[in-house]
Each structure stands twice: as structure tokens, then as C-alpha cells.
UniProtKB/Swiss-Prot annotation:
Pfam families documented for this protein: NA37
Cross-referenced InterPro entries: Nucleoid_associated_NdpA
One Gene Ontology CC term in the entry: bacterial nucleoid
PANTHER family documented for this protein: NUCLEOID-ASSOCIATED PROTEIN YEJK, PTHR38772
Biological source species: Pseudomonas aeruginosa (strain UCBPP-PA14)
HAMAP family documented for this protein: NdpA (MF_00730)
Name of the protein in its database record: Nucleoid-associated protein PA14_59050
Claim: Disulfide bond is one of the keywords in the record: no
Length: 338
């Protein structure tokens, strides 16, 4: 993962309305194993988060970031100057948001395969302990990437080469609610263009319709379900969208266009590339439910075979019980009989 440019600035800010203080670095970070490890760990943490996808708002006084980025890429300003302009804008937006807290702001322009990316993340420290050379336990501070809540990644290659794209920016959807992350999204100037959960649900609906139209046997349907979910999960893990072309080929190498053509002919309105939503995928793979001391969870493909749902009676009928459960029930029945 070649790193072309990287820099870190510090914004000191508390969520109490006090002014934000910027400590700007005046030179890029040099090449080192430490920065490579940081970026690798950052990407791993970022890829595991739930994200939204979108594209740049039209450049304006309210959304100047894309203009600065374009100037940097065209060579009209250097990376340090671009990052300084951007972090000063972020500082201003932080001061306007009473919910925001400061942190170290990382800008990293790197290449993965043939694709250029710009990663921007607000990093925080955590207090821990370490053992020093004298074998004494001492306080230790480290960047806590597990608490990564505000970060974005821009696919520079997609932005510059595909003007119609609406999903070349991804950013973390904050757990604290939309208001907490609003200022960071506005800092990037990102407009959400793809509803990942909705697109994923539509894809899964199209898949279910396709399986039904092909009148597949249960085992074949289960295998194709696993293929879809495994592919979607692996793409989500590396932070890349699914492509309908690739998915269709994985579904049937003998008829690699079958699923793709089915989707297009039925006009589901799906984008060629779909960011996978992990929560929606998990719900598709398993049915789960809890209520009043009862917990049920089973794989989706068992519905209609070992598990039957009667909607009118509001009941589930389960056949071929797990051995452990069956033994427990037998023992309990014997105890009651005594």
C-alpha cells in the first residue's frame, strides 16, 4: 500500500462551547513502518464500521473541500497546504458544533492496487499501561482505532474518472446520532447518494425472486445464498462495494450473465455497484427473535424445510431437533413424570 503523502494535525476542543485550538504540522510525515502500520490498522478498523456512501456537493463557500482537493491533485498547491486549508475549515466547523470534540486529524493519500484514495480520520488517544526496559509498569498512551467514529475515505480515481458516480466517498455513520457526525460530513462536503441498507435489501429481494423463478432445489438455493452473502461480506470487510457483474459470475460460472440479465430485465433499479450493508446481510442469513424467556435463531434456508411457519396460527413447527436440545427435553419430561 504505497503512501504518497501523509500528515497529522491536532485540534484541541471540548464539547462545551470553548474555542478550538489548532496545532498544525508544517511538514509531511516521512516514510516509516510506523505510518504504514497506522494506515493499515486504520483501514482495518474503518472497513469494519457501518458506512454511508455519497459524492461531493457542488463546490461553494459552504463546501470548499473538493475545490482544494482538486487544486492539490492538479499540482496547484502542495499536500501540506491542502491539508492546512482543510483542517482550518474543520476547526471552524468544530467550533460551530457544541457536540464535537477535538483530536488528531490524519490526512493520507495512498494507493491500493491501481486506485488512489484519500483517507481523513479524527483520532483519539487512550490511556493504558506498558512494561519498560526496567521491567516496571508505566502509563502508556496509544491511538485508539477501536474508537474510530469520524472518518471518511475518498476514491480519488473514481471521482476523477467517473463523473456520473454517486458513491466515491464513504464515511462512518456515527453511533451518537446524525447530529454528531453532521459537521464532519459537511466538512467533506458529502451528499449521500446511495442508501446502502435499501440497496442491499433490493438486491436480496432480486436474488430471492431469481431463485424462485429458476425453481432451484433447496441445496442449490442454499449454496447460492452462501455465495452471495460470502461475497458481500468479503467486499464489506475490505471497504469495497459489490459489483453486479462479479456477483453474477460467482453465482453461476456456466451462465455468468444469468443473474445480471435477470436483474436488468426486471428493472429493479439497482446500481452497478452496491455497498453491502452488513446488518441487512445478517438478517437475510438468519432469522432471530427473543421474547419472555424465549430465544430462537436459525438459518434462513431452513424455513420451508425443517422449519414451517403458520402465519394464521402464529406458530413455528420444527422437525429434526438438535440432539442436545432433544436430550434436555427428554430428561425434563422424565423428571416431571417421576
Amino acid at each position: 500500500m504505497p503512501i504518497k503523502h501523509a500528515i497529522v494535525h491536532l485540534i484541541e476542543k471540548k464539547p462545551d462551547g470553548t474555542p478550538a485550538v489548532l496545532h498544525a504540522r508544517d511538514a509531511e510525515l516521512g516514510d516509516s513502518q510506523a505510518i504504514e502500520n497506522l494506515l493499515a490498522d486504520l483501514n482495518e478498523s474503518y472497513n469494519a464500521k457501518n458506512k454511508a456512501w455519497g459524492f461531493f456537493q457542488g463546490e461553494s463557500g459552504a463546501y470548499p473541500f473538493s475545490g482544494w482537493l482538486g487544486e492539490y491533485l492538479e499540482g496547484d498547491r502542495d499536500f501540506v497546504g491542502f491539508s492546512r486549508e482543510a483542517v482550518e475549515h474543520l476547526q471552524k466547523l468544530m467550533e460551530e458544533s457544541n457536540l464535537s470534540t477535538g483530536g488528531h486529524v490524519l490526512f493520507a493519500h495512498y494507493q491500493q492496487g491501481m486506485t488512489d484514495y484519500l483517507a481523513i480520520a479524527l483520532l483519539h488517544h487512550s490511556e493504558g499501561v506498558a512494561v519498560n526496559e526496567s521491567l516496571e509498569v508505566t502509563p502508556s498512551r496509544h491511538l485508539d482505532l477501536g474508537q474510530l467514529h469520524l472518518a471518511a475515505r475518498i476514491n480519488i480515481s473514481e471521482w476523477r474518472n467517473n463523473k456520473q458516480s454517486k458513491q466515491y466517498i464513504s464515511f462512518i455513520k456515527g453511533k451518537g446520532g446524525r447530529k454528531v457526525s453532521d459537521y464532519f460530513r459537511d466538512f467533506i462536503g458529502c451528499q449521500e447518494g446511495v442508501d446502502s441498507p435499501s440497496e442491499t435489501r433490493t438486491l436480496l429481494k432480486a436474488f430471492s425472486d431469481f431463485v424462485e423463478s429458476e425453481d432451484m432445489a433447496e441445496e442449490q438455493a442454499r449454496e447460492k445464498t452462501e455465495t452471495l452473502v460470502d461475497y458481500a461480506t468479503s467486499q464489506a470487510r475490505i471497504g469495497e462495494p459489490m459489483t453486479l457483474d462479479a456477483l453474477s459470475e460467482l453465482m453461476d460460472d456456466q451462465q455468468p450473465r444469468a443473474f445480471y440479465d435477470y436483474i436488468r430485465n426486471k428493472d429493479y433499479g439497482l446500481s452497478p455497484e452496491i455497498p453491502a450493508d452488513k446488518r441487512t446481510l445478517n438478517q437475510f442469513r438468519r432469522f432471530t427473535g427473543r421474547a419472555e424467556g424465549l430465544s430462537i435463531s436459525f438459518e434462513a434456508h431452513l424455513l420451508g424445510s425443517r422449519i414451517e411457519y403458520d402465519e394464521e396460527r402464529d406458530t413455528l413447527q420444527i422437525s429434526s431437533l438438535p440432539t442436545q436440545l432433544r436430550d434436555q427435553l427428554k430428561r425434563r419430561k422424565a423428571q416431571i413424570g417421576e
